[in-house]
Amino acid sequence: MAPCMLLLLLAAALAPTQTRAGPHSLRYFHTAVSRPGLGKPRFISVGYVDDTEFVRFDSDAENPRYEPRARWMEQVEPEYWERNTQIAKDNEQSSRVDLRTLLRYYNQSAGGSHTIQRMYGCDVGSDGRLLRGYEQVAYDGCDYIALNEDLKTWTAADMAALITKHKWEQAGAAERRRAYLEGACVEWLSRHLKNGNATLLRTDSPKAHVTHHSRPEDKVTLRCWALGFYPADITLTWQLNGEELTQDMELVETRPAGDGTFQKWASVVVPLGKEQYYTCHVYHQGLPKPLTLRWEPPPSAVSNTVIIAVLVVLGAAIVTGAVVAFVMMRRRNTGGKGGDYALAPGSQTSDLSLPDCKVMVHDPHSLA
């Protein structure tokens, strides 16, 4: 095969769920996986409106059916589920044939596991009109065949895919796919956006922070996190004194958080002690303006010790001052004689031992 250009079909299919005028997309992801010795291939079909999964079919389910994955899909009539369940089962059967066919095209043995991925759908603008339609097929993670932007022709990735291309051209496959993309796909997307507008047209702004990670050779990694945002489109950049560090930055793909929002991070390696010269910038449509963040070091142990010592000294000074003030007040009240009590006439101080007196701290909550 030609050099593999891994399609991000599964990554997109795993993506889950502001108010947005557009564009919007309706996409379906089909995955068929052979598993020799473990039974028939598994077939999964997942549908997305923008970044929200709304339907799913899994051939491994106890009762394989097209099932809603979003609450707003409960408004769809029962016939929708019956019709699409049958379509999914037909696609499951076709995928088994396709897996066997590609084994033959690539002269592969039947002993290994192989995967076919298919993604198709449409994008519409804020006016509801079609912006583009697409269909892509991958085999074992590599491009196989794709519908071109004109929606009339196909691009084959290798010699094996050319066989499929010729068959599809003879069968008029592009014309049928174009009719669907320009018609039913756009119509259903409009309907889904209307039914699910509370979810699909919302915006959740990202919560961002920077973490600090030690490295050898007097280096550290600064990692800028953006969490809990929707929709998935976001930009994270690092700057050094105002200049972007695109080449030196590690950036991960946007990932689903599992709660209908997304997360992402970008990191740079910087010299130890120079962290404050680096800033992270977060751009998202849910933010009134971009965020700018720096690494904020926690208070040092020395600073904490000094603060505690100062508080102890101040506390001791306050207590000492209160005691001195109390004694001075008592002296004034007794005319400076040094005490409140005089010995009774005839008392013999030498005959009595002093009691074992202990200071009792008064409990302000006690009634005694």
UniProtKB/Swiss-Prot annotation:
Span list, region Alpha-2: 112-203
Modified residues (Phosphoserine): S350, S353
Protein name: H-2 class I histocompatibility antigen, K-W28 alpha chain
Membrane-topology annotation of the record: Single-pass type I membrane protein
Domain Ig-like C1-type: 206-292
GO BP term, example: inner ear development
Recorded GO CC terms: external side of plasma membrane; lumenal side of endoplasmic reticulum membrane; MHC class I protein complex; phagocytic vesicle membrane
Molecular functions per Gene Ontology: peptide antigen binding
Residue span of region Connecting peptide: 296-305
Statement: the UniProt record of this protein carries the keyword Nucleotide-binding: no
Protein localization: Membrane
InterPro entries referenced in this protein's UniProt entry, alphabetically: Ig-like_dom, Ig-like_dom_sf, Ig-like_fold, Ig/MHC_CS, Ig_C1-set, MHC_class-I_related, MHC_I-like_Ag-recog, MHC_I-like_Ag-recog_sf
